[in-house]
């Protein structure tokens, strides 16, 4: 292949000369198609990965990657209690790649002001006791999205979303009554100390965050009784493996009060959200296939023009004894320079555009429709490498068949015509 590469290189650098300028427009079109295709594919992959990570993070922030709950629960926020000891938390937090574990308790209710009311999910978290394996607690998620005030520090303090704040005209410092209905109506007075905004409207409009002891008091639970345990992990791709380990340690086993424990991961808790996210993968495949088809068509056109533009050269080499395989390899090498050049520029432009969006959030989005306020970007160098290697290999494979036109070029006819 050394001779083929050398000849292809000389032909490539001769393309700007006067006698080769007839083929330059077609080559530039093919080059542009490769560049545009690479830019679109890179942006598509990084945006989809970023969007999925944002949604996964927000869903996990309101719940967790894995939850340990009572086996008798019926998938509502009015949960049967389980007894959670410190030793149980330590057994789970000792699992590799677990970020933190924490008790939680939830209870549906109604928030009422003088002029309006709103159904809520009150989620209680410990204010100062958590067994952690890296991150202090589940409050960290809300710290990142807090836009006013601070996190709760006392038993009667809560944070609400900006959606709920606007709807009910409540601000930091406002007090309100929440009503919880069982056999009889129970009320609690809370003071708002913080307002968060995750742009995830399905959850923002419902969740009020406060002290876990409020739910324990409302339900008449003891100190060790809670709705469940949140288990957050560091790497979402390890969810199945870690879930299996959590199940092996506590799944279908009784707690200290005889309640059987059950584990469920974030996908089981939110099947609709994750089914929707899976559809995004299909969109990526469709876009990549379209870009490959468009770029492939232009690359094939460029190769054919390169061959037809060099028929005299091909005829001379055939007359000197060069076989068809040798000549096809020359032009495949020459086409590879075009592909590599286009991919290089496509990567440079695509990565620059992604970096601008990542750091400066140039393109905004409507959070009520997309759950994020700007186009999210996540750099995933594994998929980036797969994309580049795959694009190059596919581009070269689709050129093998068109290069067979060289076998139909007769040196006698070409030299006679010239």
Where are these regions (language model features)?
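Transmembrane alpha-helical interface segments in multi-pass membrane proteins
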Residues: 304, 311-357
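Peri-transmembrane interface segments
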Residues: 16-28, 239-297, 306-308
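C-terminal membrane-exit region of the final transmembrane helix in multipass inner-membrane proteins
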Residues: 2-4, 11, 380-418
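A structural signal for hydrophobic secondary-structure junctions
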Residues: 82, 86-224
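Membrane-interface junction motifs in transport/secretion proteins
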Residues: 52-86
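N-terminal Sec/SRP start-transfer signal
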Residues: 1-38, 418
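Short helix-loop junctions at transmembrane helix boundaries
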Residues: 329, 344-389, 400-404, 408
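A hydrophobic alpha-helix feature that marks transmembrane segments and, especially
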Residues: 42-50, 281-319, 327-330, 402-403
């Amino acid at each position: 292949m050394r001779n083929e590469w050398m000849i292809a290189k000389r032909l490539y650098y001769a393309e700007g000369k006067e006698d080769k300028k007839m083929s330059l427009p077609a080559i530039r079109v093919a080059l542009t198609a490769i560049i545009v295709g690479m830019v679109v594919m890179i942006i598509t992959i990084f945006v989809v990965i970023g969007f999925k990570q944002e949604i996964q993070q927000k869903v996990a922030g309101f719940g967790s990657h894995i939850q340990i709950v009572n086996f008798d629960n019926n998938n509502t926020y009015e949960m049967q209690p389980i007894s959670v000891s410190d030793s149980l938390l330590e057994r789970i937090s000792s699992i590799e790649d677990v970020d933190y574990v924490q008790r939680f308790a939830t209870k549906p209710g109604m928030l009422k002001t003088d002029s309006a009311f709103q159904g809520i999910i009150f989620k209680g978290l410990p204010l100062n006791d958590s067994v952690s394996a890296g991150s202090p607690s589940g409050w960290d998620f809300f710290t990142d999205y807090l836009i006013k005030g601070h996190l709760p520090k006392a038993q009667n303090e809560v944070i609400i979303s900006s959606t709920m704040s606007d709807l009910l005209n409540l601000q930091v410092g406002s007090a309100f009554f929440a009503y919880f209905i069982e056999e009889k109506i129970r009320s609690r007075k809370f003071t708002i100390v913080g307002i968060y905004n995750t742009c995830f409207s399905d959850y923002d409009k419902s969740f009020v965050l406060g002290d876990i002891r409020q739910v324990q008091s409302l339900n008449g639970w003891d100190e060790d009784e809670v709705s469940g345990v949140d288990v957050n992990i560091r790497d979402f791709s390890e969810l199945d493996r870690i879930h299996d380990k959590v199940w092996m340690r506590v799944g279908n086993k009784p707690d200290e009060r005889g309640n059987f424990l059950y584990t469920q991961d974030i996908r089981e808790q939110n099947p609709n959200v994750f089914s929707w996210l899976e559809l995004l993968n299909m969109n990526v495949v469709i876009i990549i296939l379209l870009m490959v088809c468009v770029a492939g068509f232009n690359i094939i056109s460029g190769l054919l023009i390169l061959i037809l533009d060099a028929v005299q050269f091909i005829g001379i080499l055939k007359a000197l004894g060069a076989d068809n395989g040798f000549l096809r390899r020359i032009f495949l090498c020459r086409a590879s320079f075009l592909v590599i050049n286009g991919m290089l520029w496509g990567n440079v432009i695509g990565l620059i555009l992604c970096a601008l969006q990542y750091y400066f959030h140039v393109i905004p989005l409507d959070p009520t429709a997309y759950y994020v306020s700007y186009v999210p970007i996540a750099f995933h160098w594994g998929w980036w490498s797969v994309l580049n290697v795959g694009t190059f290999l596919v581009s070269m494979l689709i050129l093998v068949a068109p290069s067979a036109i060289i076998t139909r070029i007769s040196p006698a006819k070409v030299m006679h015509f010239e």
